[in-house]
Amino acid sequence: MEQELNRLGVLAHSATDAQRKRLVENLRDLMISLETIDDTLERIVHTPFEIDGAKIGVNLGIFRTLTQSDASMDAETLAKMTGADPDLLVRLLRYFASARMIAEHGSDSFAANKVTRALASAKGESYVDVFYEMVLPTIHELPNFLERTHYRNPTDRYHLSFQDAFNWEGDLFTFFEADPHRQVLFNRHMQLQRSSITNWGTMATLLATNQSPDAVLLVDIGGGVGHQCERIRANCPNIQGRLILQDLPEVMKNALPIPGVEAMAHNVFEPQPIKGAKFYYLRGVLHDFPDDQCKEILRGIVGAMGVDSTLVIDEMILPDRNINWQATVMDLQMMANFGSQERTRSHWVRLIESTGLMLRDVLYHGLDEYQGLIIAVKTM
């Protein structure tokens, strides 16, 4: 049996990313099929311990400390380095090892592994902090919220499990305005999470038009402080034309000073002020809103589009069946926090066609299973 498992490991190292993901899913199915009823129940009910344990490890700096050395460390050494009580720390270390967050090489001997390095990274710490402080409280309230609302699909962003979790009357955006600490956590997480899911070869080809340097090439609508505009300038250096970054006034106060990018305050629910741009770009914006509000946003853009304008929607495009667990979890997060959702291709088509647009193409980035560019033009 060990030989078969080793053979799978070798196969995984030479597989494409799509093959690797299929292998992971198949092995997950196999693992579940081997569980007893008690195994299954224990796995499900104890899942919250992983994020709680990871948060403790991040707070203590355990993962960072272990990754700074190639050698194993004992609990006493780690206690001195972290300031934790040795008796407590050894119990935590045993849990981390059992959850495969760290490696246990012997009695009282612990070291970093692949998971440790992931949790010690800036992206890993950001994931843990944001999910522990912001996502989990909202998801924890979701069962009670759905029961209380008689299992109706939530679409009112002011009446969600998010409001129940944080005793808040406004939406998530006003919550951030009142809580700068969580706003910083969220912005940092968004920057790190989305930094590696754009296929820059695809983007460069799309944006390579014979545009006048004085004409507007792209309007990044709801683009935050400008991280994606910065990446566009860095990864597509030969494109011609102006880049305009738009977001709310309070966001634009912190816009990055990016050469070749103009910052402009704009609310997505107001008519688009830039007329006749070559590309209007919405990245991760529409999944924050239910369909009715998305239609309002899209109609505001359609009114500004010229005959040569193209709308580019950069989002997840889900299949109609066999959606992976990561995407379904994201969909439930959007429901609980925004009253919105992730959408299938057929849903996207219905949405854009209802606002005077027609689908021209879908270009998948190929770096994430479902992330892609929805290319739409104005119906004439």
UniProtKB/Swiss-Prot annotation:
Disruption phenotype: Impairs the production of usterphenyllins and uscandidusins and leads to the presence of trace amounts of atromentin.
Any GO BP annotation: methylation
Top-level taxon of the source organism: Eukaryota
Function: Nonribosomal peptide synthetase that mediates the biosynthesis of usterphenyllins and uscandidusins, p-terphenyl derivatives. The pathway begin with the biosynthesis of 4-hydroxyphenylpyruvate (HPPA) from L-tyrosine, possibly by the aminotransferase ucdG. The nonribosomal peptide synthetase ucdA then condenses two HPPA units to produce atromentin.
Catalytic-site annotation from UniProt: H287 (proton acceptor)
Sites where the protein binds S-adenosyl-L-methionine: G222, G223, D247, R283
GO MF: O-methyltransferase activity; protein dimerization activity
UniProt KW keywords: Methyltransferase, S-adenosyl-L-methionine, Transferase
A Pfam family hit: Methyltransf_2
Miscellaneous notes: In the absence of ucdC, its substrate, the terphenyl triol intermediate, is unstable and is partially reoxidized to atromentin. Most of the terphenyl triol intermediate is very likely converted to non-detectable products.
EC number(s) given by UniProt: 2.1.1.-
Name of this chain's protein: O-methyltransferase ucdC
Pathway: Secondary metabolite biosynthesis
Record gene name: ucdC
